[in-house]
Amino acid sequence: AYPIHPEIFDRLYTDWSTLVKFQRTRGVLRLMAAVIHSLWEKGDRNPLILPANVAIDDPRVQSELTRYLSDNWVPVIEKDVDGPNSLPLKLDSELPNLGKFSACRRVARTIYMGSAPTTAAAHKGIEDRRVKLGCVMPGESPAVFGDALRRMASAATYLYQDGPHYWYSTQPTVTKLAED
């Protein structure tokens, strides 16, 4: 499947295929066509396509990722995942050690890919080690993405954590509601 990292196919065939409307073969092909086209248009030079490289800010990709979900995920994406004024972009611009790798944005994309279809499941979310697996390119330090994950978990409105598991929900966290 090179250059597509196996973690993408694991997420699509394990998590996304549980959605009623998501057709395993057609859904995967449609999504990956949109993802590859978006990366090609942007001139992406990464050696692998990881969950972190899925350009959720691209309207075509976003449409493929939200069309199968029952709830309205667009506000979540715009605020906490990959919008032009999103928290990950803000953190990446404020913190050069994270911004050099777009670490917060890559963490947010990976969590979305691994958690959006499983919000109704008993075991929600994606483990922190799978987040790093979906983000880190050869030669990069996993610790940078661990730092980005911690910062995202403490500041994001729709990001939940239970032990090593992280997931997005369409409902804001109680902590963020209390702060607002």
PLM feature segments, named:
Residues 146-150:
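Short, hydrophobic-biased segments on the C-terminal half of alpha helices
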Residues 1-109, 117-126, 133-144, 154-167, ...:
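C-terminal helical "lid" subdomain and adjoining coupling/linker elements of P-loop NTPases
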